[in-house]
Amino acid sequence: MYISAKNHQTRSYLPGLERINTYKSLWLKHWAEFGRVYQLKYETVFGVITEEKIIEVRKLMECGRFSNGFERHKCPECGTVLIVPFTCKSRLCLSCARKRLFGWSLNLSLVMNTLLKHSHITFTVPGSVGDMLFERGYHADQMIPLSANLFRNMLISSAKLNGKEYQPGILAALHKCGNGLNYNPHVHLAATTEIVNIKTGEIIKNVFLPYKQMRHAWKKAFLAHLKKKGIISDIECRELDDKYQNGFHVYFQPITADNKEDILFKTAEYIAAGYFHNSQIIAVDHLEKTVTFRYKSWVDRIS
C-alpha cells in the first residue's frame, strides 16, 4: 500500500513493495527445491502436483507486487492518494484468505436469517479411519451430504415432525486437514436448531437435540456408507464398530454474538477459515528446513 498527501509536513507512509511474512518466505525460498524433491520421493504416495495447484502457488508468491497492477484512489477533499496493489485471491495466501472471510460474511447476509438460533456442528472421524481413507483414495466430499442429511433427519425426528416442508437451514463445508496440518477430513455445518415450515413460514423452536445419539448415528451412517462404496469390507466395518463404541465425535457449539454482523462473521469463520495462520509459526530454520508451529490438538478418545 502506498499513501501520499498534499500536506508535506505530515510524514508520508513508506510503501512495502511486496507483501511478505514468515509463511510466504517459506514458499519463496523452498518451492523450487520442493518441486524437484517431491517428484522423486513423494509423487507415488500423494499424487502429481496439478497445474491448477502450481498456479495457486505462483499467485501466492506474486501477491501484492505493484508490477502486477494496482488501483489508485484519491480523496477529493484533502488530496490524499492511496495506491493499493492487486492481491492474488488464492486460498494459499493467508492475507487473502482472511479477506475472503469478510466477503463470505457479506454473502451470508443474503441467505442467512440471523434471527434464528444457529449452531456450529463438526462431524469428525477417528485418526486411524482418516489414515485409511487417505490410503484408499476416498473422495471426502461425499461426507457433506451424508452429515447434512443426518443432522436434518435427526432434528426433524426429534421434533416428531413429518414432511419435506419442514427444514432447518444448513451451510456445509469440508475441511481436509486438521490443526496439525495432517490429513483429517471433517465436515463443518452452520445450521439452525430451529425448524421452519417452508410452506407456511411457521418456526418450530426449542427442539431437543440428542447429542450422544448423534455420535452413534454418525458412526453407523458413515461406516455403512464406506462399506457401500467398497472402501471397507464387512469385517473391517464390524471391527471399527466394536473399536469405537462411543461413536464418532460430533462437536456442537452455539453461534452467538451481540449483533448481526458478528454472527455472520463468526459463521463465515467456522465455514471458510483458512487451514493455517502466520501467527502460529514459532521458528523457521532454513538450513535444517524445519518449521516449528503451535496448534491445538484434539485427542482421539476411544473410551
Language-model segment annotations:
Residues 1-303:
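Beta->alpha loop/short-helix hinge microenvironment recognizer with preference
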